[in-house]
Regions:
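Short, flexible active-site loops
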Residues: 155-159, 186-187
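Accessory alpha/beta interaction modules
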Residues: 1-152, 159-163
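Low-complexity, glycine/alanine/valine/leucine- and proline-rich hydrophobic stretches
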Residues: 141-148, 169-180
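Generic structural signal for hydrophobic core residues of well-folded globular domains
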Residues: 16, 31, 158, 178-181, ...
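Short, charged alpha-helical interaction segments and adjacent helix-coil junctions
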Residues: 1, 5, 74-79, 172, ...
Length: 278
């Protein structure tokens, strides 16, 4: 009997959506507010790391960054814990990608929209029932009039109920895949295997597809997530301090198990020089 890993983990999420263009295209088509006739047919991956040429020197790394042949850009993020500045980060990333287009075209009319899809394993809009939140630049009074450029979507995974969007079959299947498949899965639902995209994704998260070192990193990732979630209700300053300590503790464990500084940095987001001092 096959065993499965949780697709929300950094290792598996990037394997499924960061290495298989057809799967990330299917996910984006199912969850983003794309106009009729403008669904994604072909997609190309771009480097997930972008170093802004701005005075603040802010670096940002996203999970998946890709573009279509017509120039539209797409950012996909899997966020395990909600933080107060995550919306700002999503806006910053989208704005940076939008502005960077001027490197190649000084004609503003050639600027193409940027879409940001943020999957969040936490509830952050506690006073509204909806779990999909679409932000865009609209006229305050005439909301049908908008400035094309940014579309930022947040999905609160814990609020997801299949019946609430039953008419959107692929959206339901992708969200069920993200919320139902994990190490306790004994039987994959038949409807998952009836979809070529979902069945491919299920195969990609089989535990047997990963090395011992990758599985150790997977377990350490969840250790770090547990620390972060424990601290999530703390005041922001305490939360950030605790999150940093959680990353350092994860790095110490990985270092003790023989992981390279580069691999530890990739998993934790810590700088290599910090890791070498541990």
């Amino acid at each position: 009997m096959a065993k499965y890993l949780d697709p929300k983990a950094d290792l598996t999420f990037k394997k499924v959506f960061g290495e298989h263009p057809n799967l990330v295209a299917s996910l984006l088509n199912s969850l983003l507010p794309l106009p009729a006739g403008e669904e994604i047919a072909d997609i190309e991956y771009m480097s997930p790391e972008r170093v802004p040429r701005t005075s603040i020197g802010k670096n940002s790394i996203v999970d998946v960054f890709c573009k279509t042949k017509d120039g539209r850009k797409f950012i996909v993020e899997m966020q395990m814990c909600w933080t107060a500045d995550f919306k700002d980060r999503a806006l910053f990333n989208s704005a940076k990608v939008y502005v960077d287009q001027l490197e190649h075209a000084e004609d503003f009319s050639l600027l193409r929209p940027v879409y940001s899809l943020n999957l969040v394993d936490a509830v952050f809009e506690k006073d509204v029932p909806e779990f999909i939140h679409h932000y865009k630049v609209v006229h305050e009074k005439y909301t049908d009039r908008l400035i094309e450029g940014f579309h930022i979507v947040f999905v609160e995974l814990p609020k997801f109920k299949p019946q609430s969007i039953a008419e959107r079959r692929m959206a339901v299947l992708w969200l069920r895949f993200l919320t139902e498949i994990n190490k306790t899965t004994e039987r994959v639902p038949d409807e998952f295997m009836e979809s070529s995209e979902i069945s491919q994704a299920v195969k990609l998260v089989e535990e047997s597809a990963y090395t011992r070192e990758q599985l150790m990193g997977y377990d350490l990732f969840w250790d770090a997530v547990r620390v972060a979630k424990t601290l999530a209700s703390a005041p922001e300053r305490s939360y950030k301090a605790g999150l940093k300590e959680g990353k350092l503790e994860t790095a110490r464990k990985m270092k003790g198990k023989g992981f390279s500084a580069a691999d530890i940095a990739d998993l934790t987001g810590l700088a290599v020089d910090e890791i070498e001092k541990l």
